[in-house]
């Protein structure tokens, strides 16, 4: 018997889901898979798609990125099979999915450390406090805090040039909430892009730059970028696998997800096979592309959730700040 309390959390067993699947949009073909969403998650998914496609003929997989918000919109309209996400689904997106009878399985696949970066030729900036980051990025700083010596007097009297993910980005949502205190609250006089490679190029070419994006994009260009330590009151901490696993890199550590359309997974054997392959290879692939893999227990819980058809989210549409890997495991187990 299924637990009625799960309905309040948006979690429904697949057996109940199947009673109402006929109204959902079918997959493009039985052998096609459409993926869209986070540019942060994209390198993991792209690598897994390449590995899966290398040994699987006749499956057409289209993987793109438009930001977490843009990806959820497409997903909840039934236009894609999988949404890559760098934050949990929010209440507005949950409503859109519900309105379109899109049920989903939420699968954590890695941890990220949002990395604050500058140009490596910048020899005076080594760390910033959370309060300094807030002063730099908050809306009130627009056209008022524009030079580095306004952050600290010992910094040079030179312009601050800011590089930020776009407003559809889950990284933008998470950073602004964690640092400024409200998701989406940010000054507008910045260079924004949903493409993290454009942000990387901007920082690389600009001595007085400051930007942020997912850890893998820093790791991939580590010789061309300088990570800035984040001081949350206990001294500066640099992003790394070790500082994330020890819950030291706060508040900019966060989980990464894929969301799978449960109805399409029922109808499309190739999609089911791909998700199984994804979970089996997520740890090694996350490490390879530069993210922090989850403990094996997390992937096992994901396999259970997917195979049992546990649909919904354990986050209730709420933002999650300062989540540790251990706390994520506890949330995953709450599906049981």
UniProtKB/Swiss-Prot annotation:
It comes from the Bacteria. Coiled coil: none annotated. One of its GO terms (molecular function) is phosphate ion binding. Residues 1-27 form the signal peptide. InterPro entries: PBP_domain (IPR024370), Phos-bd (IPR011862), Phosphate_ABC_transporter (IPR050811). Keywords: Signal, Transport. The keyword Phosphoprotein does not apply. Pfam families: PBP_like_2 (PF12849). Belongs to the PstS family. PANTHER family: PERIPLASMIC PHOSPHATE BINDING COMPONENT OF PHOSPHATE ABC TRANSPORTER, PHOSPHATE-BINDING PROTEIN PSTS. NCBIfam families: ptsS_2 (TIGR02136). May be involved in the system for phosphate transport across the cytoplasmic membrane. This is Protein SphX. The gene is sphX.
């Amino acid at each position: 018997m299924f637990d009625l309390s799960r309905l309040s959390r948006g979690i429904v067993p697949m057996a109940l889901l199947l009673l109402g699947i006929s109204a959902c949009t079918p997959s493009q073909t039985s052998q096609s898979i459409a993926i869209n969403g986070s540019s942060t998650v994209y390198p993991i998914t792209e690598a897994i798609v390449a590995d899966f496609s290398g040994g699987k003929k006749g499956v057409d997989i289209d993987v793109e990125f438009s930001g977490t918000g843009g990806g959820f919109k497409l997903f909840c309209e039934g236009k894609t099979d999988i949404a890559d996400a760098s934050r949990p689904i929010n209440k507005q997106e949950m409503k859109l999915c519900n309105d379109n009878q899109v049920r989903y399985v939420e699968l954590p696949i890695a941890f990220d450390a949002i990395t604050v970066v500058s140009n490596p030729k910048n020899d005076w900036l080594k760390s910033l406090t959370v309060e300094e980051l807030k002063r730099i990025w908050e809306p009130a700083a627009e056209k008022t805090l524009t030079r580095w010596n306004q952050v600290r007097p010992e910094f040079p009297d030179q312009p601050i040039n800011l590089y930020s993910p776009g407003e559809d980005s889950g990284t933008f949502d998470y950073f602004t909430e964690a640092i400024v205190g409200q998701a989406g609250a940010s000054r507008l006089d910045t260079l924004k892009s949903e493409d993290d490679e454009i942000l990387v190029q901007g920082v690389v070419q600009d001595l007085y730059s400051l930007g942020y994006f997912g850890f893998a994009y820093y790791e991939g260009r580590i010789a061309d970028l300088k990570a800035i330590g984040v001081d949350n009151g206990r001294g500066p901490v640099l992003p790394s696998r070790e500082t994330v696993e020890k819950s030291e890199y706060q508040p900019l550590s966060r989980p990464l997800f894929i969301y799978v359309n449960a109805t399409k997974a029922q109808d499309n054997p190739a999609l089911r096979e791909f998700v199984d392959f994804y979970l089996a290879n997520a740890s090694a692939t996350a490490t390879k592309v530069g993210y922090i893999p989850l403990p094996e227990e997390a992937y096992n819980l994901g396999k259970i959730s997917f195979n049992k058809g546990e649909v919904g989210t354990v986050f209730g549409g709420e933002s999650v700040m300062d989540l540790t890997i251990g706390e994520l495991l506890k949330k995953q187990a709450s599906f049981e």
